[in-house]
Amino acid sequence: MSIKIHHGPNGSYKTSGAIQDDAVPALKDGRVIITNVRGFTLERAYQVFPDLPNTAEIINLDLESLEDLEKMRTWFQWAPRGAFLIFDETQLLFPKSWREKDLERFDYPGGPEAAHAADRPMGWLDAWTRHRHFNWDIVLTTPNISYIRDDIRMTCEMAYKHSNLAVIGIPGRYKEAQHDAQLNRPPADGTIIEYKRIRKQTFALYQSTATGKTQDTKAGKSLFRSPKLVLLLALLAGTIGFVWYMGPLRTIGGPAAATPADAPGDPAQAPAAPAAVAAPARPAANSFLPPGLVPDGPAAAPVDLNAHPFADRRISILAHAYRKSRGDIYMFALEDPTGRHLELTSWQLIGSGYRVTPKGECVVELRYEDWKQTVTCAGRQAGAVASIAPAAPVAASADAPARGQSPLTIVPDSEYASRPWRQK
């Protein structure tokens, strides 16, 4: 049992919202409805809702009839218990200009004892403050809540401010903001806002204008006439289209190099012992051996480029540092098959989803989901070794060491002249 106020400018769906949200549920419960909403009759209600309970009743009063106007103003002297009252244009029914003396005429005839015997409120204030004792629900509509008398507003439970969204180019919908009935407008914070739409069957229950013709508001401008909003929507659409066209970004760097296929050959014509040392196969892209130190044997298996984000790059340790507050810190070098070089710290790899487990200054274990690899320092070749290293594989001679023996590298003696005390 409550008193509610629906307020807002003309054409903001106050009356239709009150009927749809409040009167229709009461009608389906079989309650008696007392109202001055034009055209809201029981005949129309049965046309829209044929299965209404037999106890449902609508008492429609005409605001332009002096007799009906007086009945609405003295509703608490004759309304049955449990009735649902919905008063449209409340500012005309209960003017704010009434003073205390004007309200004395609403005292029940015969005084408080007669009112008690008739089970009626004693007067004006008693009716509005003790409406729950008589199971009355009251809904009021007005263009401006400040038109409602203070003694009525102080008994109201909630107020609902209506705004027609057609003023920003969204026809057929309205915004309803719930707030305290003592306030003239909803506060900026903590307001419950709903966006609603009136159903067609609700409009069939009543007549919103005296002529029967209705049209939406012509005030306001479309929301899409704002250049800022149009620019924002265009930027958003362009971003989504660009991402869709480019596809998801999986790895950082260039495309993965294709694994060279084995050269075709006839195994029947192959000699029992090779006459020359075959050219070493290209190391796998994630190999940690520097170029030139390639083991003999068949080519490595193709690299799974989906194992981790940097699967197409060779990873090695460039530097190591230790801080007591942060532990081991590594600098990694990542090189792809085309020679492009990338340097990342262990923190950056951890941020990319890797797990870095230090095993020493030059040994680290990297993990990424199911992938695991041990990374070491790459080091660098000595200048002397590099100077005499052949540019291309040399054919094996007849007296070459057997396959599997360790190769012997001769380094020229660059030591200065023998010391005089050195014994020969």
Curated annotation (Swiss-Prot):
Domain of life: Viruses
Subcellular location, principal: host cell
Residues that span the membrane, as ranges: 229-249
Any one GO CC term of the record: host cell membrane
Stretch list, region Disordered: 396-424
Membrane topology, as annotated: Single-pass membrane protein
InterPro entries: P-loop_NTPase, Zot_N
Subcellular location: Host membrane
Presence of the UniProt keyword Amino-acid biosynthesis in the record: no
Pfam families, sorted: Zot
Keywords linked to the UniProt accession: Host membrane, Membrane, Transmembrane, Transmembrane helix
Keyword Protein biosynthesis part of the UniProt annotation: no
Coiled-coil residue windows: none
Function: May play a role in phage assembly.
The protein, known as: Uncharacterized protein ORF424
